[in-house]
């Protein structure tokens, strides 16, 4: 019987029937994987399988192509560390929903696993300043996910002139940076490049506008590259937790 043991980040746990859960995890070495957990009520498992929690996962199945069953042991709980921080909780839900949406099942994405684990550590890090610079890490995490799946952005040099200065925009066609000189009359059609991604401070000093500009870049490529490649004939939209995350930032 096929089986494996691995670390995993819980993406979701959905009730199925009276006693069962279908748990979705991003494992370190076995990719995004579903598994059945039986009789969850008697085992007090719900607190352990909250989105973002790091768990030890044992998977076993009669046949490799079947969903199989999970045994779960909690390694680290996340939500309890940020339960009173609405924006961070929404960021965590956004991360899990994007991975669940875009990662194919059972393909090894150890790079994304490690990046996600590192971002969750950043998200839950407690310091006295209570600043929001973890949001920059969130945008860079999304860029890393795009790159790992096959849609890399090149933000270090102008695609038109080859210059590494005055980088103000990103081309929605190529995902490459464009300088002020290279943009010319096409500037209104380009995406703004915030300073924390190498832009020449085109957006000014408003931190949250910078974050929204970064999220606008990743939103564009998630919707117009990844979603279109998944559903070519259906309306495309990002997962609701990701949409709500942006809406919360817009209110700041």
Show where each model-derived region lies.
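Non-catalytic alpha-helical scaffolds and adjoining flexible linkers that form interface surfaces
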Residues: 1-21, 26-252
């Amino acid at each position: 019987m096929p089986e494996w043991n691995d670390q995993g980040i819980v993406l979701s746990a959905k009730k199925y029937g009276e006693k069962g859960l279908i748990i979705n995890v991003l494992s370190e070495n076995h990719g995004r994987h579903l598994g059945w957990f039986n009789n969850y009520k008697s085992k007090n498992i719900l607190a352990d399988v909250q989105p973002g929690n790091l768990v030890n996962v044992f998977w076993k199945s009669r046949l490799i192509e079947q969903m199989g069953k999970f045994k779960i042991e909690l390694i680290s709980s996340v939500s309890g560390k940020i339960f009173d921080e609405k924006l961070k909780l929404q960021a965590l839900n956004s991360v899990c929903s994007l991975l669940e949406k875009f990662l194919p099942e059972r393909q090894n994405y150890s790079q994304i696993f490690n990046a996600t684990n590192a971002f969750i550590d950043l998200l839950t890090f407690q310091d006295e300043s209570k600043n929001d610079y973890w949001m920059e890490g969130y945008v860079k995490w999304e860029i890393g996910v795009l790159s790992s799946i096959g849609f890399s952005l090149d933000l270090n040099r102008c695609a038109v002139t080859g210059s590494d200065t005055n980088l103000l925009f990103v081309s929605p066609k190529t995902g490459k940076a464009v300088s002020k000189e290279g943009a010319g009359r096409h500037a209104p059609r380009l995406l703004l490049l915030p300073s924390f991604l190498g832009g020449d401070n085109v957006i000014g000093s408003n931190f949250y506008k910078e974050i929204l500009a970064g999220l606008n870049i990743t939103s564009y490529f998630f919707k117009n590259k990844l979603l279109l490649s998944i559903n070519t004939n259906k309306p495309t939209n990002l997962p609701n937790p990701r949409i709500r995350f942006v809406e919360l930032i817009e209110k700041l």
